Amino acid sequence: MQVSVEATQGLERRLTISVPAEQIEKLVKDSLQREAKRARIPGFRPGKVPVTVINKRYGAAIRQDITGEVMQRNFIEAIIAEKLNPAGAPTFVPGATDGEKFEFVATFEIYPEVELKGLDAIVVEQPKASVTDADVDSMIETLRKQHATFAAVEREAVDGDKVKMNFVGSVDGVEFEGGKAEDFELQLGSGRMIPGFEAGILGHKAGEEFVIDVTFPEEYHAENLKGKAAKFAITLTEVLAANLPEVNDEFAALFGITEGGLEALKTEIRKNMNRELEQALKANVKEQVIAGLLANNDIELPKALIDGEVNVLRQQAMQRFGGQTANMPELPAELFTEQAARRVKIGLLLGEVIKTNELKAEDERVQGLIASMASAYEDPSEVIAYYNSNKELMQNMRNVALEEQAVEALLKTAKVTEKTVAFEEFMNKATGRA
């Protein structure tokens, strides 16, 4: 086998590989003879079909298969010999056979050489937060509101009430599509409607008819309504006040607490809040570390890896439609290219961090991650056993552990300061509620 390597552009490489033509001819001949022994063709006894007949019928297909196998095998030998690391599958272009040699060209991309830079320039503000008794009480109050019952009242509507209404919306005196509803139910303070809508209902009683003035946000989804001033003619048909359940052992039973009553509920709530806080704190620090790593390291990315990631993101997006994708057009790659490129870059950079620091997934950490995740389920031991018996899930957890270890390695050289924050403030920002 003879090999020549050409760097075409960027990360693309072109291998020209020559192998003895007799190598292919022998393989083709052997394959034809094997086929002749097992072929069943009318007019010939089993195992007695002439090779010339087999060649006439199947020769082209057999030669094509053999050629593909020879190219694949010799390509692998060539990249090992040349110490090349392909990113994605190669494209093969077979050439002509001149009687002595068969030549083909393999074009592919390689992984970039990654040299980590600016690791000591990564700046991280590490948040410190804890779950207080007041935070637990606040969560219990939220749970009370979620389990509230509502009853009609003869008074003005206040924040927290539910109201029922009929309304008609108009812009410049003309009704717009989707702006009309009857027997519409809304909880005041929920933030479901555009700014000013809920506030305009406060202070009104059932049976009143009134008009409120609002302005659609510039980022509103309907193009024809963005930034437009509108009027809503409203007929308020009912005001319902919330009745919150008492905080006692019966309240605790609503959440499956059968022993220990209210104190057991508080313990469970605190445990869940601590778990969510720990995950959010880790995610916050990781996000800052990754942002610094990306900002200080610019590397060329293989298009093959980006294309592969685009396909993953596209598939995930289609699955979010509930699998009802049979008649849907394929989502354009442009929707995912930027995110895909970012994910590929992060993967390459973290891979280099793992390689440089010779990191291996720590078994104790892997089991800790599984236990933390399983604690959210009714029977954690069953979930832990399931993960430990599933090779694919275990590999996913090892990858998560390795990523955590890589972030921790980067933190050692980063400029880290600590900032104490309140639980509610931090979690609201982490979940996008702030």
From Swiss-Prot:
A Pfam family it matches: Trigger_N
Top-level class of the enzyme under EC nomenclature: isomerase
Disulfide partners: none
Subcellular location: Cytoplasm
Range of residues in the leader sequence: none
Domain PPIase FKBP-type: 160-245
Entry keyword Isomerase: yes
Record GO biological process: 'de novo' cotranslational protein folding; cell division; chaperone-mediated protein folding; protein transport; protein unfolding
GO MF terms, alphabetically ordered: peptidyl-prolyl cis-trans isomerase activity; protein folding chaperone; ribosome binding
Domain notes: Consists of 3 domains; the N-terminus binds the ribosome, the middle domain has PPIase activity, while the C-terminus has intrinsic chaperone activity on its own.
Family label: Belongs to the FKBP-type PPIase family. Tig subfamily.
NCBIfam families: tig
Protein name, per record: Trigger factor
